[in-house]
Amino acid sequence: MLTIKDIHALEVMDSRGNPTIQASVILSDNTKASAIVPSGASTGKREALELRDNDKTRFLGKGVLRACENVNSVIKHHLIGLEATNQAFVDERLRALDGTPNYANLGANAVLGVSMALARASAKALNLPLYRYLGGANALTLPVPMLNIINGGTHANNSIDFQEYMIMPLGFESFKEALRASAEVYHTLKKLLDEKNQLTSVGDEGGFAPNFNNNVEPLEIISQAIEKAGYKLGEEIALALDVASSELVDEHFNYHLKGENKILDSHELVAYYKELVAKYPIVSIEDGLSEDDWEGWAFLSKELGRQIQLVGDDLFVTNASILQKGIEKNVANAILIKPNQIGTISETLETIRLAKHHAYQCVISHRSGESEDSFIADFAVALNTGEIKTGSTARSERIAKYNRLLEIEHELKGGIYIGKELFKHG
């Protein structure tokens, strides 16, 4: 029986230059594997707690030495000797050790690092790819990427209110071809921005961060880039938005679009989205309303839920009990899956199972503070979720996930690229 022999954590850096945890697990056969935990910029207030040191003399208070020490002492002490391949049991032990609903004691960053590293070590010891270990024989589907090519909101220092403008390459036969087309659109977009004397600096997730007069102009120029790159807008490559509207809302559920000098209530904002969807081939809107605006979400779902994908990120925070509330209220039809919002791989799997049971799409997602760790690429294939959101075709911490998916596609001798089949169930 494979057991856990040793566990340790190290403070390393993420893509924003902030500290994060690298956890390593060593098994009884001396197999070793590590995992680096990501970190978000715009976070849902119901997310599991990311433990920071708050020592202003180090990393402006963002150090993670306390979380590392929790791994190196408490977690290590209680997990050594446990069966390594019983992921659910180990993850439950981690939850019990912490004793709070949101990992306020040990830190979700400490717990997730160990959970990820354990899965990776067990897969390695069994000589299995991570996607096969987690997903079994049915892990065959390559996801449609949601590529963030223009950044706004909290991910960029510009005048755009919406956080992400994305492209989805649906009309292709393979992940490789879908990614190639997306890269060509990205480079074409850069040329168009250069021609307009717009900034081509990039945001946290590799998308460009230009200044526009309103939130519609990015849709226009992305549409132009798709067509100029030689692809059919809407048929081969569609559009998607992450509004991150919890960053725009006030206590009265009015939404402040500062880039357009507008203040809209929930119903007015939904009407605005309907205009955009009618004019552009937008197939997905994430966090279209605030995480607390359940009434607004119900209206949005009623108005657009049969037409496009409505993704809850801050709304659901990868939490099965909150998702259950959404299901009961007929809110949204998709959920963003971020393991660090909930704490362990097993809890993440529980949320995915619930979502799939109720025909909610699952989008496996990175965070804005990332690393070279490509765990979520394997995770998306393992769970056949059909969608992955992991940034643009720039910045090596984003490319690491795409390159891993290319490797997996090659290993699977093509696998199944879901493409246009993604939304056919609806």
Curated annotation (Swiss-Prot):
Family, similarity comment: Belongs to the enolase family.
Entry annotated with the keyword NAD: no
Stored PANTHER family: ENOLASE
CDD domains for this protein: enolase
Name under which the protein is recorded: Enolase
Required cofactor(s): Mg(2+)
Keyword Magnesium: yes
Keywords per UniProt: Cytoplasm, Glycolysis, Lyase, Magnesium, Metal-binding, Secreted
NCBIfam families attached to this UniProt entry: eno
UniProt GO BP: glycolytic process
Binding annotation for Mg(2+): D242, E286, D313
Gene Ontology cellular-component annotations: cell surface; extracellular region; phosphopyruvate hydratase complex
Record note on cofactor: Binds a second Mg(2+) ion via substrate during catalysis.
UniProt source species: Helicobacter pylori (strain J99 / ATCC 700824)
Active site: E205 (proton donor), K338 (proton acceptor)
Catalytic reactions of this protein: (2R)-2-phosphoglycerate = phosphoenolpyruvate + H2O
Biochemical pathway: Carbohydrate degradation; glycolysis; pyruvate from D-glyceraldehyde 3-phosphate: step 4/5
The protein's enzyme class: lyase
Residues bound to (2R)-2-phosphoglycerate: Q163, K338, R367, S368, K389
EC number per UniProt: 4.2.1.11
InterPro entries: Enolase (IPR000941), Enolase-like_C_sf (IPR036849), Enolase-like_N (IPR029017), Enolase_C (IPR020810), Enolase_CS (IPR020809), Enolase_N (IPR020811)
Record localization: Cytoplasm; Secreted; Cell surface
Any Pfam family hit: Enolase_N
Main location: cytoplasm
